Amino acid sequence: MAKRYLINIFLLIAVLCGFSSCEEDPYYDPYEEITYDLCNYVWTDWFVVDGLDCEQQLTFNPDGKGWDTRIYHYPSGRIDREEIPFYWDWDNYYTDILYMDYEDAQTTLENVWISGRTFKCLYNGEWVTFKAY
């Protein structure tokens, strides 16, 4: 009888521990986590524009400011660098849309996905994958 009682107590404790581990973390904030990931790296992509290799580096700061750095590589070996400041913000705390406000235009990054050192999004209508450096 005492043995069965102890077994029931252990089963009850195991069940209660199992239920408590399914509870969501009240301090987990996906907005804060993805913002940290976004601001923790320089995001780099390569593409071709007017026959030139272009390296684009996006830098996001936690204060909502950022830099779009474009480095153009000419066949002659010459390199031109263009740094364009912007302001950025999430779309009403939804972390799948990001607005980048430049001096003369706005760019919307849609379907934003960040995992590890990879940042994928729909950038001006084209799928782009940035790598973190």
Language model segments and positions:
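Short, solvent-exposed mixed-charge patches
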Residues: 131-133
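Bacterial Sec-dependent N-terminal signal peptides
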Residues: 2, 14-42
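Tryptophan-anchored aromatic micro-motifs
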Residues: 30-53, 86-92
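Broad, structure-driven detector of short, well-ordered beta-strand segments within folded domains
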Residues: 56-60
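Bacterial N-terminal signal peptides that target proteins for export
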Residues: 1-9
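Residues marking helix boundaries in flexible regions
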Residues: 8-10, 14, 35, 115
